[in-house]
Every structure is written in C-alpha cells, then in structure tokens.
C-alpha cells in the first residue's frame, strides 16, 4: 500500500474525507482542531455545515473563525487576475470586521447539539486600534452564546505585516495590551500569530520579536494565550536552539498562561524533516504535554483530504509521542482550554448583557 494511503487507513481517514473508521470498529476521535479558517483572504470559503460533514466521527470539535484581513483586488496591480491569497498580489490588505458576523450566523444555523462541536473565535478587529477591545465586547453582546476566543490574529508575519493598511501592528502597542486585558477579563482564549524572528536573519542577530513577545505574555498572566506555530512561519525558520527557547518559557511560572499550537502544513517540515528534529520536538512535548495543541490551519478545506493534510504531515511526531501525550496534544488539551473558555465567557455575558 502506498505510504500516504497507509497513513490515512491507520487513522480511519478515507478518500472522501476525515470520516469514519470501518463499520466493524468503534469510531475514535483522531483530533480536535484548534486552528481552522472557515474563509480565505477574499472572504470566500465553506459553511459550518460543510465542516460538520467533513468532521464525521474522527474530529470531535473544532474552532471556527475567518481571516480578519481582506486582500484588495486592484486593477492597476493584477488587472483581470483576481487574487485570492496574500501572495497573489502586491495590493494591500485591510481589516474586514464583517467576518465576525458571518461566523456567528454560520454557527447559529446549526442545531443546539451541532453547536456543541464548535468553538467560534472573534477575529475582525485591528490590533493597533485602541477601540479593538470595544469591538470584541460589542460582538459578544450582539451574539451572546457564540464566541469563546479571539484569533487567529496577527502581529508580525513575514509577507503579511507590511501589506496591512493603515500599517503593521506592533507588540509594543498599547492597543494590543487593551485587547489582551479584555480577553483575560472575559475569559476568551487568544490565538496569536507572531513570528519569533524575521525572514532570513543574520547568523549573529537575536530573534527580532522574542523578547517583545515574552514581555507581552508576562503583562497578561490571566489571559490564556496560544502562540500559533511555535513562532515559525512560511519563511521564518526556527531560531537557534528553538526547542530550548520554548522549554525555558514553559518552565518559567511567569508563562504559566502560555500554550503553543502545532499547526500549518508549510511549517511541518521544521518539526519532521529528520529523525533529529522529530526527537527534539517529541522530547519537548513529552516534557510539557499539557501545553501543546494540534491545529490544521486549514483554510476553507474543500474536502476531508485537504483538511487531513497537516495532520498527516506530522505523522512522524505522533509516532514518536507516547499514547498519553499524543492524546493530550490532539484532543485533551483542546477540551480543557475551550471548555473553560466556554464557561467563563458565558458567565461574563450573563453579567454584562447588551445595554
């Protein structure tokens, strides 16, 4: 059997999608998805019901959020060629707040039982705007009973940050502190993309954004923060001694509120490119098994195979982890964080109804 097909078979994934294990076996949860985009950079995508169909029995729960940035289509830049991704055009990106209403309406289109499988997130705010926290509270009051977190939103991201209008966000901006303080007060989980370093750094330079990110996390000890992709990106490679840098944070009580997601197909190579990188990643996760979550970072997956790609790419890592640790990363840690957020946010909403 082809290696790819063998892997899909062993996790009960069939060509039609992340579906059900064979009928003669008991269905089992393969993963919960801490990082799923329902829409793309031009606000097109799939419905919540489409996601539910793809989940089958193999995916128990998933986050649900759009992308807060809209790629402009400028005739002077690409003519009749409509860009659908930020790499398709030099035209700017701008913040698109309607994404939150769209996600809320998708969630509300489901039955009460179906809603239990989703954990929607607010993304449609500008993190450099001091009114961003007001937007978050307004969305919660407008759509009570829906949202449980904020993100994925971006501060520093390789090709993206410089395209955003009116300008790039910053870890030093008081608006970000306002957003994170609000999230902590309300009980929202935060999923934040922030590259630890710049693309193609010099060999002697320190990671450009590591110390700033540490300072942000220290300032908000009551806010649950998931650092997306462990701070790496498409062309942002792991920093020197990357695993040791993460370990130093996870053993520091000042970062007890910090978690990392293992996500995005384009960064899987950094974790599984060799037996050595697999061993290093597995050793780190085994040491701190409660601090990592799996996320696909799939963008409006058209079918189950597209959704399963990231999970499959991390196959060597799953094989290297103990069954207990693997289950925590794939399933258990998600449940713990988002169950708590669901309780806390619903309590905040009850105490702060719409005026």
Label every model-predicted segment.
Residues 2-7, 24-34, 43, 47-62, ...:
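Mid-to-C-terminal alpha-helical segments outside catalytic/metal-binding sites
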Residues 8-17:
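Bacterial N-terminal signal peptides
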Residues 23-105, 111:
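An N-terminally biased module of ancient metal coordination in phosphate/nucleic-acid-related enzymes
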Residues 25, 51-57, 103-117, 136-148, ...:
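Acidic (Asp/Glu)-rich catalytic clusters
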Residues 29, 78-198:
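Active-site gating/metal-coordination segments in enzymes
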Residues 32-36, 61-65, 118-122, 149-151, ...:
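Hydrophobic faces of well-ordered beta-strands that scaffold small-molecule active sites
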Residues 37-39, 67-68, 123-127, 153-156, ...:
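Active-site beta-loop-alpha junctions enriched in small/polar residues
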Residues 164-294:
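Catalytic pocket-lining loop regions of alpha/beta-barrel enzymes
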